Amino acid sequence: MTGLLKRKFDQLDEDNSSVSSSSSSSGCQSRSCSPSSSVSRAWDSEEEGPWDQMPLPDRDFCGPRSFTPLSILKRARRERPGRVAFDGITVFYFPRCQGFTSVPSRGGCTLGMALRHSACRRFSLAEFAQEQARARHEKLRQRLKEEKLEMLQWKLSAAGVPQAEAGLPPVVDAIDDASVEEDLAVAVAGGRLEEVSFLQPYPARRRRALLRASGVRRIDREEKRELQALRQSREDCGCHCDRICDPETCSCSLAGIKCQMDHTAFPCGCCREGCENPMGRVEFNQARVQTHFIHTLTRLQLEQEAESFRELEAPAQGSPPSPGEEALVPTFPLAKPPMNNELGDNSCSSDMTDSSTASSSASGTSEAPDCPTHPGLPGPGFQPGVDDDSLARILSFSDSDFGGEEEEEEEGSVGNLDNLSCFHPADIFGTSDPGGLASWTHSYSGCSFTSGVLDENANLDASCFLNGGLEGSREGSLPGTSVPPSMDAGRSSSVDLSLSSCDSFELLQALPDYSLGPHYTSQKVSDSLDNIEAPHFPLPGLSPPGDASSCFLESLMGFSEPAAEALDPFIDSQFEDTVPASLMEPVPV
């Protein structure tokens, strides 16, 4: 049904006859047919009509089927004529006269031109180029003649023959042009034709001859004296004072200018000490000029290097830091102190520093079934972050301290520090084990440390660890301790302690289940500590010395008396009389 509504090409052929017989107005209307209709007709022609029915170029283009809009891209650019067009050159000729406007280097006769031109000539562009080439050839020929004449005169003078007897031509014009044609061809081939385009100064005799040739009858002689005075005044520079400059007679002072010295006695003859010119003095300093030059070059190089570094740093800001850059990050950055839930309520605060207790285990080791963990202490897999060690000093002891070596404070050895997993209250205050404190001290001193960092405020003495010696290291573990086979004997531990405060309770406040309440008693301490099971950890075999625990606790608590005498009043009186305090007290840093 749609095919009946569309017009076919055969119907268009019939319409073309009527269109051609119609008026011009109807023919113009056929041009304004829409592109959509022409496209639809083309589709119909592809479906029903053969390709030979397509309109040929020689047909009438006024019909609707020949409508083809021109592409904008194929449209040729219209050439716009230039606004300025040169069709010819007009040359004006001026007669020569005495100038009185310039100062030649020699002589007193200057060249100038009259106010009105004497001739006018018009050339086309090609003709003017030819005229310029001809004038240059003529100038070059004249110069070659002058050179030839000068050469002949020099030969005669060298031979001692007078010019009158030799019969040489007195002027350049007397020389034949044919004699210099060969030299002219060589000069043109050598590029001397371009040298003629530059103006060359004429000597005084040549200037005088040009003026007389142009019709000048009288040459002013006064101009020669004026030009000589001008040249002398320009050559005269500086004052003529002899080492001492008098303001009343100094030419620089009278002229109102400063005295100047480029080198010794030039242009001014006065010295620095004898110059009394009120206007001042200027001296040329080679060292100052060289220094300024070097400083300028250095500044330019620094600016260039900074610019190149900025360009290299800009693309690197978006990329992740390299391992080398991460190693440059400080090991203990300033950060906020950790909260209780992060450290398992094992952190204490003081008025000076923040300390935290953490324990860690070697990666790849699993916890043995017979090694229970305490909820109050961090697990063996706890890894303290960098921010947790913000304002704390790391306290550890190396094996080199056991031999009586000096205490060394090492920076940047956090990777070698071990978490003090053996630090547990059951080993210190255990009631069932009388030697718990000594065993904890001995186990702490016998731990395998590769490097240590001692707190300078702890006042610890390494000599208290010499009693055990190195012989006990071959005996095995301490009595009452078990070493699970699954645990690595080389696993290290460390503790973060701050002993810069003078308070004796800060070390004990870091222990779990320790709270300073109003009804706190020593019995409660014993009961609470008995319920805590001591963790199992590897210990080197050292014989428990008798003085090691007392010396270590004495150094920790800051007591001058022996530890045996100071431990009882410490537990009986100081634990009961302590004011209530929380485990975590925020202290502004």
From Swiss-Prot:
InterPro entries: CSRNP_N, Cys/Ser-rich_nuc_prot. Its main location: nucleus. One of its GO terms (biological process) is positive regulation of transcription by RNA polymerase II. It comes from the Eukaryota. It is found in: Nucleus. Residues 1-62, 309-388 are annotated as: Disordered. Keywords: Activator, Apoptosis, DNA-binding, Nucleus, Transcription, Transcription regulation. This is Cysteine/serine-rich nuclear protein 1. It comes from Homo sapiens.
